[in-house]
């Protein structure tokens, strides 16, 4: 297909990756972002080989290898005893097997790499402060209205997250569902930790009704911590509730001493508990010249560490479909057909992992027995994928 003018709503990981993929295929892109400036929020993010391949293809490998950490292995531990339930090599083993590294890095570092690459790309414009309120698709063009003006393109991609205004325009308003789980997220300076107790691995501690994951980010300067607990309801008006480290210690009061030492080493003025929400699977992702990408169409729980990876895969596949297709609606339909079964699998597998991580006796013995087999099977299905 000849060079297109594509509008992308949302300057997150998925939207910016898609812009770079499109530019490298010769298309012109305008990214509309509601925030008045680039914001590099969030703590750690895991980039598995299936996503790394895409980021390498758009020229980010030098920055990734400089800013990111490659975990040596993945370890699952018993919440109270610290005994190893399962161990899987990552590092060089994953790179050799799947053709690309497994990276841990700060979300802000990944966003900086994407933003810097876009700043050097003459085919991409990013408009900050462009809060989209509506869109209209015609036969030959799509018109997007923001509070500050109107934009026109041939294709519209909603990469605007779980609260997507583009999804709402396509399918009507759908309220997100509280999953019955909440997460503490915070960073701990590694300088305050005993290096012997915390190796460069991604470690998940499994306990009844809750789990704790930690891994190194920020070129080894920080330990990213994510602690998930079950909750019967979320009564707060906001999705985010402020708290203190003492609250986290209370939630994990009977856990292994080394894990509690990790929590106690946190040196943060603010800590927040996040409610985990998802949405029902969508009947379709688009119509005509309009489609969705990432959390806008398949919001995913964090229990497979594949949320960012799915958006990155979407970005590459959608760019390829638009470049190879004969017409825009057909290209977008092909993209949806290629992606929907995989993202649905990841959504459902992530939900299942929440149950697995939080299993209670007597089911824990069965979980621990089948985890090595099931883990290898899942790893192959996820990391073997090639979106390019």
PLM feature spans:
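C-terminal auxiliary extensions adjacent to catalytic cores
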Residues: 372-388
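Short beta-strand micro-motifs enriched in acidic
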Residues: 137-138, 215-217
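FAD/FMN-dependent oxidoreductases across multiple families
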Residues: 196-197, 208-210, 218-222, 227-304, ...
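Residues at the starts of beta-strands that form the adenosine-phosphate
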Residues: 5, 28, 222-225
């Amino acid at each position: 297909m000849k060079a297109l003018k594509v509008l992308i709503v949302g300057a997150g990981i998925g939207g910016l990756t898609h812009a770079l993929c499109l530019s490298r295929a010769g298309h012109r892109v305008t990214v509309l972002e509601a925030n008045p400036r680039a914001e590099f929020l969030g703590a750690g993010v895991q980039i598995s080989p299936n996503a790394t391949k895409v980021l390498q293809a758009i020229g980010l490998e030098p920055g990734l290898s400089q800013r990111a950490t490659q975990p040596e292995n993945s370890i699952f531990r018993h919440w109270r005893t610290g005994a190893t339930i399962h161990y899987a090599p990552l590092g060089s083993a994953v790179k050799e097997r799947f053709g690309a590294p497994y990276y841990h890095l700060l979300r802000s570092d990944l966003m900086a790499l994407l933003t810097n690459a876009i700043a050097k790309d003459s085919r991409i414009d990013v408009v900050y402060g462009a809060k989209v309120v509506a869109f209209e698709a015609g036969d030959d063009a799509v018109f997007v209205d923001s509070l500050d003006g109107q934009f026109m393109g041939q294709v519209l991609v909603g990469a605007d997250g779980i609260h997507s205004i583009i999804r709402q325009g396509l399918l009507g308003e759908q309220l997100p569902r509280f999953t019955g789980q909440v997460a503490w997220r915070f960073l701990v300076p590694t300088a305050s930790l005993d290096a012997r107790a915390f190796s460069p691995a991604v470690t998940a501690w499994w306990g009844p009704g809750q789990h704790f994951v930690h891994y190194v980010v920020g070129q080894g300067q920080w330990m990213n911590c994510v602690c998930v607990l079950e909750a019967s309801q979320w009564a707060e008006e906001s999705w985010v509730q402020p708290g203190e480290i003492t609250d986290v210690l209370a939630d994990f009061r009977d856990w292994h001493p080394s894990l509690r030492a990790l929590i106690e080493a946190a040196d943060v003025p603010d800590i927040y508990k996040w409610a985990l929400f998802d949405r029902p699977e969508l009947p379709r992702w688009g119509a005509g010249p309009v489609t969705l990408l990432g959390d806008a169409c398949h919001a995913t729980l964090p229990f497979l560490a594949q949320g960012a990876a799915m958006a990155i895969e979407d970005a590459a596949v959608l760019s390829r479909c638009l470049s190879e297709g004969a017409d825009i609606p057909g290209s977008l339909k092909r993209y949806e057909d290629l992606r929907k079964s995989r993202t649905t699998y990841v959504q459902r597998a992530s939900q299942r992992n929440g149950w697995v991580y939080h299993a209670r006796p007597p089911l824990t013995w069965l979980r621990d027995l089948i985890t090595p087999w099931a883990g290898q099977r899942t790893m192959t299905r996820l990391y073997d994928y090639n979106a390019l």
